[in-house]
Amino acid sequence: MRLEAHRSDQGRLAPTDAPSARSSAEGAFDAPRSGPTWKLRVDTAPDAQTANHRASLFALSNGVLGVRGGIEEQEGGAGETFLSAVFDRTPIFYHERFAGFATASDTRVPVVDGAAMLVTLEDGGALGEIVAFEQILDLAAGSSSRRTRWRSAGGASIEVLAERAVPVEGEALLAIRFRLTSIDYTGAVSIRSRLERGRRGVAQGDDPRLGAGAGARMVTLSSAAEGLDAVMIQKGSAADMRTACVQTHRLVAGQIALEGDFAELESCGSLLRGRLAPGESLVLEKIVAYAFAVDGDEAELAQAAQRLAARHADIGFESLKAEHARALGVFWDEAAIDAPDTPELEAALRYNLFQLRQNAPRDGKTGIAAKGISGEGYEGHCFWDAEVFACPVLSVTAPSLARSQLMFRAGTLDRARRHAREMNHARGALIPWRTIAGDEASAYYPGGSAQYHINADVAFAVRIYDRATGDEAFLLEHGAELVLETARIWLQIGAFNPRRGGAFCITGVTGPDEYTALIDNDYYTNRMAKAHLSFACEVVDRLMRDHPVEGPALLGRLGVDAEETDTWRRAAAAMCLPVDQTLGVHPQDDTFLDKPPWDFQAAGAERPLLLHVHPLTLYRCQVCKQASVVLAHTLTASEDLALKQRDFDYYERVTVHDSSLSASSFSILAADIGEMDKAAAYLHDTAFVDLDDLHGNTDHGLHMAAAAGSWMALVWGWGGFRPQGETPRFRPVRSDAAPRYAFRVLWRGRRLRVQVDATGVLYTLLGGAPLIIDHDGLRLELTTMAPTLAPTPAPRPAHREALVRREPPTPILAALIDLDGVLTDTAQAHYQAWKAIADQIGAPFDEQANEALKGVDRMASLEILLRRAPAAVAAGRQALADRKNSHYLDLIANFGPDNLFAGAREALVAARQAGLKLALVSASRNARSLVERLGVADLFDHMVDPASLARGKPDPEIYLRAAAALHVAPGACIGLEDAKAGVEGLRAAGVYSVGIGDPAVLDSADAVVSRIASLRWERFLGP
C-alpha cells in the first residue's frame, strides 16, 4: 500500500507506509503521480509555535499571486497574501550618509487577504476546538486540501473540507472550495466570507533576514460589498502602486443562501446562512481576483478584477483545478525527479522543485525573490542566488521561467547603469545586490553593494540559459547587452598588478561568504569574473560572426571595440587565482589565511552567528558563513581533484553553514571528489532546509535558492551534470544514499531522462532531434529510437594526493617512520591516559591541549601537563608517568593487525619493494611490543630504543641514531611524522620530512599527505 508522505509529530518528512515492492527498477521510476512522495501531508493541527512554519510549507502561488497556507474558518488564521509586483517603498535613514549609499528600500507587503471564511453556529458560538486534522499539498495537481473536525463548546462536531488552488498562469486568482459537513450537529450555520486588509508584516527586530522595511502594510482606500461580491482598493503607504481585490461566490450544494453583506474600511464581504443535520453538507466556492498597476485608476482596477473573478467563477473550482493539474503535468513530464529507494528524500526533492516552479515570476518584470512569494522574509528582495541557483535549474526544467528572470535583469539594466554611476564607475552596469524594482535597496554596503560578484552571477545565468536553450533571439536582443555592460565593471575595480607578476587583481569587494567583507582578490569573485570576461569575449565573437548586421550595430551602440575586448581577454588570462604554497589551498582572499581561526568552543553553539556576533568580530577570524572557494569549484571549470580535495577539507573546517545555500555547494563538491557520505549528509541538509526549518526562519517564507540547490545537489552532484559547455556533460555515480535515481532535463528542445541504477546509466531521449552528450568523457549520440545504456562510473576515490612544498633530494635510500598517528591510532589511547592524569591533578585538558603532547616523550609530556595544574602536585613525577603508562597499556592491550591504519601495511611493503631500508622512530617505550602486536615488526630493519636517548623529539637525536643504524646519511632519508615536534626533529636532522595529517598543523613539513594510504613512494623516490 502506498500512502502520502507526511509530516510526523516530530516534524520530519516520512512515508506513512513503505513503498510497495516493484518487480523492476523501471516500475519504481514510473510510479504514478498519486504515489506517496507526491503529497506533503500533516495530521496535527498547527499551534502558535508552528502556525507560521506550516503556512509557509503549504503556500500556493503561480508566480504572480502567493497565498500562505492558513485556516480559512479560524479568526486570524487564513494567512498572508502577496503579489509579486506589489511593494512599498520607504526611505533609508543614516546617521552618516555618504555618496552612493542606497536611498530607499522596497518592501513586498501583504495585500488583501481573500481566504477568510469565519464560521459560527446557531448560538453564535465559534466552531470550538480541533479534534482531528489533516492537511495535504498535492505536488502533482498543484492544489491543497485541509480536513478539520471541530467540536463546539456544546459538544457538536462539524467537519470542514477546504480545498485551494492558485490555478491560472499569469493571473492573480485564488480559488477555494469550502465544504461544511455535520457529524452530529443540527442547526443553523453562518459563514462570514470576507476580504480583510492584509496584516502588517513581521517587524525586523534583531533579525536582519527580515529587512528594515518589514512591518510595513498597504493602506486601504475603499471597500464595498453587494450580495455575493465584494471589492477592496489599496495603495502603498509610500509607493504609487494600487491594487483591487474582488471576491465572488458560487453556492454549490446544501441549504445555504445569501443573508446579507457588510462593508467596513478594513473588512467587507458576504454573510451566508445555512442549516445542517447529521450527514448533511453545505458547499460553496469562492473566487478571489486581484488587479494592480502603478498609478492605476481605482475604478478600472476594480472592473478588471471583477471580470477576472466572474469569468473563472463560471468555470467552477473543479474545472479550474483540473486544468491547473494538466498544466503542471506538462512540467513534471519535463522535469520529474525520482529517488525510489529513499522516499523521504524523493518527496523533499519534488517538494522543493514544485515550490521553485510555482514561486518563479512569469512576466519578466519581477525577479525571483529569496523567499519567493511565500512570505515576507528578506522584504521580498531578489538577490544573486536567483541567478546562481534558481536559473541553472529552471533553464533545463522550465526555460521560460529562467528567461523571465533574465528579462527582469535586462529590463532593469538602465537602473543598474545608474547604480554604477552612483558607485563612481564611468561605464557599464552594476547589478544591485538586493532589489525589487531594480534599484539598490541594501543599507549595509559591506555586505551589499560590495558584492560585485553579482555581475558575474548574472552573466553565469545567461551563459547557462544560452547553452541549454540556444535562444539566440534572447542573446541578441537582451542577453548580449546584459553580459557586456556588466563585464565593463571588472576593469574599473581591478588592475594588472606588477607586484604580483602582472596578475589581474580585484580589490575592495565582498564575496558570497558574508562573514568576510571588503577584501582583495576574493577567490569566488575572481574566478567568476574570469568566466564572465571570457564569456563576454565569446559573445562579441558570436555577434560579429553570426549576426553580421545586428552584431556590429549593437557593439557600436554600446561602444565596445577591439581594444576593450582584448583587455578583457588579457584580464581573464591573468586573473589572480593563487594557491597557498604552505597549505596547498586556494586562499579565500588575500588575508583570510592570515587571520586567527574562529574559536568554536568559546563561541558556543548559538546559530546563526549573525544574530549573536558583531560583524567586525566575524571579519577578523577564519570563519565562513558559506565557503566562497567551495562554491566557485561547483560553478566553474574543473581543476585537479587533489586541489579540490584540499580546498574542501580546509574550508569544511571553518564553515558554519549559516547560509541556507552552503550545504548545496558542499554536497556537489563532495560528490565530485568522491566523498559520497558527506555528499549525502549535505544533500539532506539542503533538501530539508524548509521542511525541517533547519535555519529557524522558514516562518517568514521558503528558501528558493536552497530549494533549487537540493535539485543541483542530486543532479550536479550525483548526476555529474554540467551545462556550461555546448555539449551537456554527465558523470552519474551511485551510493548507498541514492542507489537509484532519475532526473529529466530539457536541452535545446529535447527532453532527456537520465536513470541510474545497478544496471548502469540509461539515457532516454523522450522527444526532439538527436542529441550528443558527454558521458564521463565518452561521446554518445542519443535518439528517440531506443534508450542508450552506459556504464555507471565509480565514485572517485578521495584525491588527497601529496602536497609537496619542497622537492626531495636524490637518492632516497631509507625511510624513518613514526608509529603513533602514522601506522596506527594510539593517539586516542594516549589522550585518554593523559586525561586521566590531568583529572587527577586538576589540570584543564582537552583534545586541543593534547596536540602539544603529540610526538613528545612521556616525561616531557608530563612536564607540559604539570604546567597546566593549578597548584603544586604532591605525587612524584615518575609515579605519575608510570600511572599514565599503565592506563595506556590497558587501553592498547587488545591491539592487533586490524588496528593498523588502512593502507599502512601496504605502504611498508611497497617501501621494501622499492629498496628502502626502514627504521621505526617512535618516542613510545612501548613501540616494539606494539608493532609486534600489529604484525609489522618484521618489516623494519631497525627500531630505535627511546630509553637510550638523551633527548626526545623535537631534538634530532632519534633520527640521527636511526640513519646511523641503517648506514645511510640523513640527507638520503625520508621521514614520516604526524606531529609538529616530529617534523621539526626531521628537519633539524636534515631528513626530508613528510607530514601525515593536516597541512595547516604540519606547516613546516616538506610535503604532506592526509593519511598513509595516500602515500605514493614513487612521488618521492624519483625515476
Name what the model sees in each region:
Residues 52-83, 389, 437-438, 515-543, ...:
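C-terminal capping/lid segments that line or modulate ligand- or cofactor-binding pockets
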Residues 890-920:
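Short, acidic loop-to-helix structural element flanking the phosphoryl-transfer center
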Residues 103-153, 159, 641-645, 652, ...:
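Non-catalytic C-terminal accessory modules of carbohydrate-active enzymes
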Residues 360-374, 400-460, 466, 473-477, ...:
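Helix-terminus loop motifs that line ligand-binding clefts
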Residues 382-410, 477, 534, 538-541, ...:
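Active-site core of glycosidic bond-cleaving carbohydrate-active enzymes
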Residues 805-813, 909, 925-1023:
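Asp-based, Mg2+/Mn2+-dependent phosphohydrolase catalytic module
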